């Protein structure tokens, strides 16, 4: 795919966002020539691939081992101690405005994105008492980064004077994959230490984001950190504005998309884990589940790291020894905890819907769900209570009960009015299924295309040479996986959008080039 200047339906406000056109081809498959495609994994990546393939007329079967779609953003029904039926999920996720391809997927069933609601700010608070806000920060780079520095109490003039400006220059011109070639061998912590960011700013502005990768910044590749800075600060004028679903994930996002897929003729098989994928002579593969085997002309593997490792290990006919070793080398991030607590009284009206935290013994953020989610708001209105969610990423030690208790104690510390609140009920989600991007891992990440022309990969663990991350990487690789299969059959794929793939201006690019002129 190549960037084009031709007009396309805009996906955001940034006039420098780039559009990537797919290979030319027919609009869809002709009747009678539709290939059969198995998409294995019903998370964001799998849903993106399945949706595009079904729209182009392919005969799609979507396999998902869980009983609902959404992958790591799925939800399940549960009954509380007060008899209320509610949805439990992994909770707060920010749908940033520069997640163009993810938002494009959601527009299939919600053209105006009316089921997303904006949050006014992304406040960050350190245990030392300092708080940062992005509400008044300009959105256009480089004024966004400069505005954050000027407005932030964590940056003093002495701190700015002590910073190593030359070491920070690579932030001004982030390119993919070059950023990995230069910085994948360096940890995020080492890079920040080299820049000499103030320690409080280090914690608030960077550690909070690096832990969004569910990783300790001492282990995370600095390339991922630079990419984050590009996506949110210096590469995009969308800024740190984001939306959240106004109902639980299943109702707002995945059930409508599942219905859409079925209307397109796709066979959606939830509660159906795949055991093996074995190549067939002449192309395609046989997909085996507990109920038997089915032959397909093409396959998309859109799985989390553990499931991908397991399926490839059980399917000895896939790939080369080196490719299989690379799959086996994909690491999973440390466990994380989402605690959702239903309280008998509201939190203070001044509390934000979301608060990022640092220095609070492992507590990474607090969400007040009844500020933005309809189901939680209705429960709070009916009971007079509130629904609060606590996240802890990269949990490496401690008994689960102790960690859960510790998060509640930190909530009491940060929001003292909760100390006297009665806990009506609580749910705790412990998971360890997100990819880890440690130092030096980029070269071994699997690509979308494989040596089998009928097999593609998708997911946020898959290498993507575009400036995307997290949910947007999942959606983008899902579309790329489908595009590759469609292009091989002469059918046009999905138009993709991305934040600029280099520094936004000649000045920024020239300054960034100084970092290599040593």
Give the residues covered by each predicted segment.
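Extreme N-terminal leader/targeting segments of oxidoreductases
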Residues: 1-37, 55, 507-518
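Mid-domain catalytic core of redox enzymes
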Residues: 2, 6-17, 33, 272-388, ...
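Mobile amphipathic helical/loop "lid" adjacent to a hydrophobic cofactor/ligand pocket
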Residues: 8-10, 102-103, 107-108, 113-222, ...
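N-terminal Rossmann-like FAD-binding beta1-loop-alpha1 element of flavoenzymes
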Residues: 33-62
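Glycine-rich FAD pyrophosphate-binding loop
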Residues: 54-79
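Helical element adjacent to the flavin cofactor pocket in flavoenzyme catalytic cores
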Residues: 228-290, 294, 298
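FAD-binding beta-loop-beta segment adjacent to the flavin cofactor pocket
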Residues: 376-382, 431-465
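Active-site-proximal substrate-binding core of FAD-dependent oxidoreductases
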Residues: 484-518
């Amino acid at each position: 795919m190549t960037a084009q200047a031709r007009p396309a339906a805009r996906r955001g406000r940034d006039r420098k966002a780039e559009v990537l056109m797919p290979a030319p081809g027919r609009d869809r498959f002709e009747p009678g020539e539709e290939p059969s495609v198995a998409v294995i994994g019903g998370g964001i990546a799998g849903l993106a691939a399945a949706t595009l393939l079904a729209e182009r007329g392919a005969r799609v079967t979507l396999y998902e081992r869980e009983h609902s779609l959404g992958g790591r953003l799925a939800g399940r029904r549960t009954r509380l101690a007060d008899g209320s039926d509610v949805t439990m999920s992994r909770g707060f996720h920010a749908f940033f405005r520069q997640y163009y391809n993810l938002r494009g997927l959601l527009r299939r069933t919600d053209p105006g994105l009316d089921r997303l609601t904006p949050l006014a700010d992304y406040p960050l608070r350190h245990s030392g008492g300092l708080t940062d806000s992005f509400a008044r920060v300009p959105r256009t780079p480089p004024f966004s980064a400069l505005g954050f520095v000027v407005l932030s109490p964590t940056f003093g003039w002495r701190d700015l004077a002590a910073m190593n400006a030359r070491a920070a220059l690579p932030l001004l011109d982030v390119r993919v994959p070059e950023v990995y070639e230069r910085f994948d061998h360096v940890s995020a912590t080492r890079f920040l230490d080299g820049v000499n960011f103030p320690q409080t700013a280090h914690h608030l502005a960077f550690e909070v984001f690096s832990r969004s990768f569910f990783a300790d910044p001492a282990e995370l590749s600095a390339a991922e950190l630079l990419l984050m800075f590009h996506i949110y600060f210096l590469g995009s004028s969308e800024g740190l504005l984001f939306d959240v679903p106004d109902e639980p994930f299943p109702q707002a996002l995945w059930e409508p998309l599942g219905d859409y897929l079925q209307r397109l003729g796709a066979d959606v098989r939830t509660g159906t884990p795949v055991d093996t994928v074995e190549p067939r002579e002449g192309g395609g593969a046989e997909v085996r589940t507990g109920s038997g085997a089915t032959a397909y002309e093409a396959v998309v593997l859109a799985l989390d790291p553990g499931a991908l490792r397991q399926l490839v290990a059980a399917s000895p006919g896939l790939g080369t020894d080196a490719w299989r070793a690379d799959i086996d080398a994909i690491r999973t991030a440390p466990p994380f905890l989402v605690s959702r607590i239903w309280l008998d009284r509201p939190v203070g009206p001044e509390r934000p819907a979301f608060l990022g935290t640092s220095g609070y013994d492992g507590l990474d953020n607090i969400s007040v769900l009844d500020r933005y989610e309809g189901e939680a708001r209705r429960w709070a209105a009916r009971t007079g209570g509130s629904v609060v969610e606590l996240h802890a990423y990269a949990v490496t030690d401690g008994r689960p009960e102790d960690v859960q208790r510790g998060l509640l104690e930190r909530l009491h510390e940060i929001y003292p009015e909760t100390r006297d609140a009665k806990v009506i009920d609580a749910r705790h989600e412990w998971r360890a299924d997100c990819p880890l991007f440690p130092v030096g891992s980029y070269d071994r990440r699997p690509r979308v295309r494989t040596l089998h022309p009928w097999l593609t990969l998708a997911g946020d663990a898959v290498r993507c040479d575009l400036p995307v991350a997290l949910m947007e990487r999942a959606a983008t690789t899902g579309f790329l996986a489908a595009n590759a299969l469609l292009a091989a059959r002469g059918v046009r794929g999905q138009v993709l959008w991305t934040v600029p793939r280099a520094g936004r201006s000649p000045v920024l690019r020239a300054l960034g080039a100084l970092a290599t002129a040593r």
